[in-house]
Amino acid sequence: MKIPAMMSLLLVSVGLRDGVQVQSYSISQLDIFSQETPLDMAPASFDDQYAGCLADMTAALPDLNHSEFQANKVYADGWAQANNQWQERRAWGSVWGSLPPSPPGFRDEHGVALLAYTANSPLHKEFNAAVREAGRSRAHYLHHFSFKTLHFLLTEALQLLRSHRSRGCQQVYRGVHGLRFRPAGPGATVRLGGFASASLKNVAAQQFGEDTFFGIWTCLGAPIRGYSFFPEEEEVLIPPFETFQVINTSRPTQGPARIYLRALGKRSTYNCEYIKEKKCRSGPCWLGSSAPGSISASCSLLLLLLFLVLSALPENPGLQQLTRC
C-alpha cells in the first residue's frame, strides 16, 4: 500500500521522544481503521529452531510437503508459483541479474521457500497468522499447523544466509499496516511473533505501513534480496525467536506509532517437535521437554523419588544405574 505524500512527511518529521508518550489523543483516520495490539514475547508463536534435527527434518520433507499440499491450497498454489519463478531464474536469471552465490548447504527448496514467502499472494499473510498461533500448544502445532515445511525451510534458510554474511548485526526498518503495536515500555523484552519482513532502506519500509513504524537492530535477520520477488525492496527477514529490548517509543497524536528495538538474543519454547512425534509413532520414546537443554517435569520428579528411596537404603552400586533419566 502506497503512503500518501502527507503521511510520508509525517513519517520523516516525527522525532523520537523520550520514554513512552502517555496521552489522550483525538480520533484520526489511523485510529479508526487500525487495530491496537500489545507488543510482547508472543507466547503463542511457534518458535522452533530445529537444533539437532536438521538432517531428520530434511529427510522428512518430501512426505510432509506432499501431505501439506493436499491440506492447504494456499500453500500449494504459492509454492507452485514460487517454484516456477525459481526455475526461471536459475535458467535465465532475472531483470535484477543472476542468482547470488548460495552458501554451503543452501538447496533449491530454500530458494523456493523464500520466493513463496515474498510473493504478492495470500500465502505470507496466512502463514504468519498461523505461526503466531501454532505455539499455543504442541498438539495445536502437530494437528492444525499446515505450514510445517515452509516454517522449517525459512528457518534453515535464514540460518544459512546469516552464516554466509560478512557482517553481523544490522539496522533495518519495518512498516506495518493495520496494527498499532503497544509495547510495555522502554526496557521491555519482546519478540515479533512471526517471520518479520524489514528493509535496509527506510523509504522502502515506509511503503508497507502507516500505523506502526519500527527501527530495529537485528542480529538474527538475514538479507534475502537475491531470493525475493521484489529485490528492490532490500528485504531482511527476521525469525520469530529473536528477542529484542525496547529502546524507545513514541505515540504521536497523528501518524504512526514509532518503536525502536535492539537485539538481545533468542528464545524458543519448542524444538524439533515434528521429529519427536514422528519417532514416537514408530516406537517407544521419551519426548522430554520441548525447550532444548531443559529437564522435563516427569524426569525431575522421578529423580527426586529415586533419591529419597536410595538415601534410605544401604549403598548399592547397581542402583546407581536407575538414576539415569
UniProtKB/Swiss-Prot annotation:
Recorded topology in the membrane: Lipid-anchor; GPI-anchor
Removed propeptide positions: 291-325
Enzyme class of the recorded protein, top EC level: transferase
Record keywords: Disulfide bond, Glycoprotein, Glycosyltransferase, GPI-anchor, Lipoprotein, Membrane, NAD, NADP, Nucleotidyltransferase, Sarcoplasmic reticulum, Signal, Transferase
Keyword Glycosyltransferase set for record: yes
Protein location: Sarcoplasmic reticulum membrane
EC number: 2.4.2.31
GO molecular function: NAD+ poly-ADP-ribosyltransferase activity; NAD+-protein-arginine ADP-ribosyltransferase activity; nucleotidyltransferase activity
Signal peptide: 1-22
Positions bound to NAD(+): Y117, R174, S228
Active site per the UniProt annotation: R174, S197, E235
Known glycosylation sites: N65, N248
Reaction catalyzed: L-arginyl-[protein] + NAD(+) = N(omega)-(ADP-D-ribosyl)-L-arginyl-[protein] + nicotinamide + H(+)
UniProt-listed InterPro entries: ADP-ribosyltransferase_ARG, ART
Disulfide bridge partners, by residue number: C53-C272, C169-C219
Residues where lipid is bound covalently (GPI-anchor amidated serine): S290
Domain TR mART core: 73-268
Tissue expression per record: Abundantly expressed in cardiac and skeletal muscle. Low levels also found in lung.
Function: Has ADP-ribosyltransferase activity toward GLP1R.
Protein name per Swiss-Prot or TrEMBL: GPI-linked NAD(P)(+)--arginine ADP-ribosyltransferase 1
Organism: Mus musculus (Mouse)
